[in-house]
Structure formats: structure tokens, C-alpha cells
Design a protein with these regions (language model features):
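Cysteine-nucleophile active-site neighborhood
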Residues: 248, 272-346
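ATP-dependent carboxylate-amine ligase catalytic core
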Residues: 3-88, 96-119, 132-136
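Internal gly/pro-rich beta-alpha loop/helix module
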Residues: 102-214
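Phosphate-binding active sites in nucleotide-utilizing proteins
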Residues: 218-294
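Residues that mark the start of a beta-strand
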Residues: 13-17, 219-221, 247, 323
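C-terminal and late-domain segments of enzyme folds
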Residues: 216-218, 230-240, 247, 333-336, ...
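Glycine-rich phosphate-binding P-loop
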Residues: 1-3, 222
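A short helix->loop->beta-strand "cap" motif at the edges of active sites that frequently abuts
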Residues: 90, 146, 294-298
């Protein structure tokens, strides 16, 4: 729905900036394709309100329209999408799945609108509508004080394919642009009414200079893995590294035989389990990563990037692949989610915030140097491993949570 709305306005000549609430990698890939503009995550716990405020303020200076896609339900999580909307006074349009629903649609709309009195609730949008007459029933159920922002019919041709971690990556989705374009063309009533304009400068934001960071990474070239196996990257992470002086050089553990000429490596998460044969067969790349480590150079490996550095990785079908072998141990993919949530961890460099989300279990023969702490009291801690200048964990670090400490990981 958000992708369709972004493309709808883009097709009409507007510059659209889209943000994603919370720690997500897959939805942003789709939304970037739809809007044609870079996407950043807004997470009040990981990045803080000043960081989120700055991102929105900068986007408002260049965009005609800002869309923010929520995460889960409007009030789910702590912080939740409603918290973000309330803090920055951003109008909320609730997208409600209307499948097998009539008057209950209005009851849901009224409940969402009144659940928190301070929430700037603007109205509702009906998704997966069966027909024009079905929409009329839905519209008649909406209380008069609420606005209907339109509707989208149910259509299998615009449904985006998924797998165990969520949507397929944009690069893997067949006919993605065609699906988005069709969804945008199918939107009904979205141009009829718009919410009240948010004046960031006078109503929520004041002019502020962009935060500057010491050039701790000046002259440091960082090789960042980016391909179909490793693609879970926050733009804000790369921006912070560059702002501190680093030069980013992308490479592919799947397709390249050697590393670029770099002083440090960043192996983000992704889907190494879907590319076992190719990763296992690329002996030259594995050897070059080992040589990089043996030379005393830094490596930061997150989630799938960490699994790649183990001795072996086994998928859910029992297929096994020989990995890099820098971390003594093995991992096996699981059919069910094994950990999820926001986490913080205190390392000698400083305290980091981030999140974990994975379907694997691993055994490592070295002792962790630290364990993360879940933001939820009942969350499961994640171990952090160190081997020389290698730092590895299931955690996806959010570098803006501790920029200078993040720089130290790559030195």
C-alpha cells in the first residue's frame, strides 16, 4: 500500500521521501524502488528523537510529500508507530484490511482514532476491498468526524511475494515495478483529500545545524559486502561511517574472487543460507577474508555475515556448506523464528543499540566477550564474539546510536 501511494505521487511529478518505522531492511528496498529516493529508518529507541527529527527535517526541505510506513499495528511495540506520530505531530492514516468486513470497519476506525486522545489521527484507508459496492458499505460505516482517504481492491497480481524473514528483496522480486505501477493505478480516491500540512520548522522543528563527527575514520577504506546474500544495511550506518572520514567500497562474497583494497570489512546480514553452494565454492574469497583477518585488520560481522564466518552453515533441508572458518563453530537454520527484538550491548568501545531477528541457532567454540540486553524484560540475550580484530554477533548494530564507538570497531 505504501509503495503504491509513493509511486502514485511520483508518477504525478512529486518528489516523495518515504521512511520506515522501526528496524526493517526488506520493506525499505521495495519502498526505495517505488519512490525512487533513498529510505531511512525512524526508530526512537535505536536512534533517539533528535536523530529522527534531523532526518525528517532534512527530508522536508527537499520533498513534496513525506510518507512514513508504520511497523506492525499502530500501537504495537515500545516505542510504537503512534509514539512517532505523536512526537512529531504527523497525521496518521490507518490502513485497514477490509477482507470479509462491513460495519466493523467503522468500529475499528473509531477505536483506533480514540485509543489515544493526543494522537493526530487523520483518517482511514480501506485495503483489499472486494468491489465498489463493498467500499460503499465500508465508507458508510466510518464516523463522520473521520476522513476516508480512499481504497484499494484485492488483487493477487499486486501482492508481493514473501519468505521466512519477510518480503523478497527488491532485486529478487519478479516484475516488481510492474506490480507497484499496477497497484498505484488501482488506488481509488487518494487524490481527493489530503491531511493537514505539517510545517516542520514552525510547528515541530526549529532550524538546527547538522551534527558533525570527528574524522576518526579518515583514510580508512571499508569493504562492505552487498549482494543477494548480504544486503541488510542501514543507510544511516554507511552515512555515519562516511561522515567520519571512511571510504566505502562495495564487494560481493558471491561473485568476486578477491577483496577490494581495504583496511576493514563490514559483513552485514542477509540470506547466506539461500546461497550455500556459491558461497562455499568461492574458495578465493574465503581465503582472502582469512588473510585480511590474519593481517590484523578489522572485521564487523552481523547476523548472516557472522554465519558466513563460521566453519559451516546448514539450511532447513539439511544441506551443508563450508564457510570461511574464522569463527570455530557451526549454525543450522530453523523453521521458526529463534530471536527477535531491540537490544543494547556494552562493549569496551561504548554502548550500542540495535536489533536481532533470525531463524538460526549457532554453536561457537569461543567464549562470548559480552551479551546483549533486550529492551523487553523477557527477551533473550545475544552473545558477542571477538577473535582478534573481528567483532561478530547476531545483532544488527545501529551506528547512529553510538557513532564514535562504531568507528572504533573498524580501526
Amino acid at each position: 500500500m505504501t509503495a503504491a501511494l509513493a509511486r502514485y505521487h511520483r508518477d504525478r511529478g512529486r518528489r516523495v521521501r518515504v521512511f520506515k518505522t522501526g528496524p526493517d531492511f526488506l520493506d525499505p528496498m521495495i519502498l526505495e524502488r517505488a519512490s525512487g529516493e533513498p529510505l531511512y529508518q525512524l526508530d526512537l529507541w535505536m536512534g533517539g528523537d533528535v536523530h529522527c527529527r534531523q532526518l525528517l527535517y532534512e527530508a522536508a526541505g527537499e520533498a513534496d510529500l513525506i510518507l512514513i510506513e508504520g511497523v506492525m499495528g499502530l500501537f504495537d511495540g515500545n516505542p510504537c508507530s503512534a509514539d512517532l506520530a505523536t512526537l512529531f505531530n504527523i497525521p496518521v492514516m490507518a490502513v485497514i484490511d477490509s477482507t470479509a468486513m462491513a460495519q466493523t470497519f467503522g468500529a475499528l476506525a473509531l477505536g483506533l482514532a480514540g485509543y489515544r486522545s493526543e494522537l493526530p489521527f487523520a483518517g482511514v484507508f480501506a485495503n483489499r476491498v472486494a468491489s465498489q459496492s463493498h467500499y460503499q458499505m465500508l465508507a458508510e460505516s466510518i464516523p463522520p468526524e473521520l476522513t476516508s482517504f480512499g481504497w484499494l481492491a484485492r488483487d493477487a497480481d499486486i501482492t508481493l511475494p514473501e519468505r521466512h524473514l519477510g518480503l523478497l528483496q527488491a532485486i529478487e522480486s519478479d516484475n516488481l515495478d510492474e506490480r507497484i505501477e499496477k497497484a498505484a493505478a488501482a488506488l481509488n480516491g487518494v487524490g481527493d483529500v489530503m491531511p493537514e500540512t505539517v510545517n516542520f520548522e514552525t510547528r515541530t522543528f526549529s532550524k538546527q545545524s547538522k551534527v558533525s563527527y570527528p574524522l576518526h575514520l579518515k583514510g580508512v577504506r571499508i569493504g562492505v559486502a552487498r549482494d543477494q546474500a548480504f544486503a541488510f544495511l542501514y543507510r544511516s550506518n554507511l552515512d555515519i561511517l562516511v561522515e567520519m572520514g571512511a571510504e566505502i567500497k562495495f564487494f560481493s562474497p558471491l561473485n568476486d574472487s578477491v577483496l577490494p583494497d581495504v583496511e576493514a570489512l563490514y559483513l552485514p546480514g542477509g540470506y547466506p543460507e539461500l546461497h550455500l553452494d556459491s558461497l562455499a565454492a568461492n574458495e578465493l574469497m574465503k581465503a582472502d577474508i582469512c588473510a585480511h583477518h590474519a593481517a590484523g585488520k578489522a572485521i564487523v560481522a552481523e547476523c548472516g555475515g557472522m554465519l558466513y564466518l563460521l566453519d559451516s552453515l546448514t539450511d532447513t533441508e539439511g544441506r551443508n556448506g563450508s564457510m570461511v572458518g574464522l569463527l570455530p563453530g557451526k549454525a543450522e537454520m530453523q523453521a521458526r523464528l529463534t530471536n527477535l527484538g531491540l537490544h543494547s550491548v556494552a562493549l569496551p568501545e561504548g554502548e550500542f543499540r540495535g536489533h536481532t531477528f533470525h531463524h538460526s541457532r549457532m554453536q561457537c567454540d569461543i567464549e562470548p566477550v559480552a551479551y546483549s540486553e533486550s529492551a523487553r524484560h523477557h527477551g533473550t540475550p545475544e552473545p558477542i564474539f571477538r577473535q582478534g580484530k573481528l567483532t561478530a554477533s547476531y545483532l544488527h548494530f545501529y551506528f547512529p546510536s553510538s557513532p564514535e564507538a562504531s568507528a572504533c570497531l573498524f580501526l
